[in-house]
Amino acid sequence: MQIILLEKVANLGNLGDIVKVKDGYARNFLIPNRKARRATKEAIAEFEVRRAELEKIAAEKLAASQAVGEKLNGQSFEITQKSGVDGRLFGSVTNADVAELLKKAGFDVEKSQVRMPEGPLKMIGEHGVQVALHTDVVVDVTINVIGDHA
């Protein structure tokens, strides 16, 4: 299916690009989330009329993400979990736990924005986690997992 992108999409293209994607990806993700529209003649003409407005909105989102990223980058957060004497956690710290921790600290972060390269945290200690605030703004934070011996 040919679509026109209404915002920058990672690994796909930038605002205004006309790209070919699988039908399911377009119907189930891109179009419902208002990231794209079918690339019909009418849609392309309407996009060209609204292009400046969409570019302005995209620039505002990027600026807001960069401002939050400057505050968040390099910060360290602590979370306490039950653990055994050997330092292994009972359960794990997931991206949802990290997103909740960041929300309590005053940052508006969704769990889908938290990237954990090694998967959920299962040991006590300091761990690096990435937060993707925007497709162009990815910041690193440190999560210090403190063990609460049961």
Curated annotation (Swiss-Prot):
Role played: Binds to the 23S rRNA.
GO annotations of cellular component type: ribonucleoprotein complex; ribosome
Similarity remark: Belongs to the bacterial ribosomal protein bL9 family.
PANTHER family, per database record: 50S RIBOSOMAL PROTEIN L9
Key words, A-Z: Ribonucleoprotein, Ribosomal protein, RNA-binding, rRNA-binding
GO biological process: translation
Protein name as annotated: Large ribosomal subunit protein bL9
Transmembrane segment boundaries: none
Superkingdom: Bacteria
Claim: Nuclease is one of the keywords in the record: no
GO molecular-function terms, A-Z: rRNA binding; structural constituent of ribosome
Species classification: Bacteria, Pseudomonadati, Pseudomonadota, Betaproteobacteria, Burkholderiales
